[in-house]
Amino acid sequence: MMVKVTYVDSANVSRTIEVAPGVSVMAAARSNDIPEIESDCGGVCTCAACHVYVDPDWVDKTGTASKVENGLLSLQETRRPNSRLSCQITLSEALDGLVIHTLEPEE
């Protein structure tokens, strides 16, 4: 089964992709040319460049941020209660239909 993920960019333009379970939200975005998700550290949770907002309907389903992830997010001026690092959310069948809001890249 493929998992559908919808990415909504900072201009409110949405794009839905289908990917195999087991990849991160960040890796799925990067391999499908989704703009506004950077990957400075390659997805190892050391940079916060892949900061996204999880749609409120999906926050409980995506789990909670680890201590390391929370530490990186605490340095972000744009942090919200639904902020996550997209490299730390692994897609599964339970997340089929997930909606992610991306941030405009910093200059």
Swiss-Prot record:
SUPFAM superfamilies: 2Fe-2S ferredoxin-like. It holds the Pfam family Fer2. GO terms for biological process: P450-containing electron transport chain. Binds 1 2Fe-2S cluster. Pathway: Terpene metabolism; monoterpene degradation. The keyword Iron applies. [2Fe-2S] cluster binds at residues 41, 47, 50, 87. Disruption phenotype: Mutant cannot not grow aerobically or anaerobically on limonene, but it can grow on perillyl alcohol or on acetate. Induction: By the monoterpene alpha-phellandrene, but not by acetate. It comes from the Bacteria. Keywords: 2Fe-2S, Electron transport, Iron, Iron-sulfur, Metal-binding, Transport. GO terms for molecular function: 2 iron, 2 sulfur cluster binding; electron transfer activity; metal ion binding. Residues 3-106 form the 2Fe-2S ferredoxin-type domain. Its cofactor is [2Fe-2S] cluster. Transmembrane segments: none annotated. Belongs to the adrenodoxin/putidaredoxin family. Involved in the degradation of the cyclic monoterpene limonene. Probably part of an electron transfer system involved in the oxidation of limonene to perillyl alcohol. This is 2Fe-2S ferredoxin CtmE.
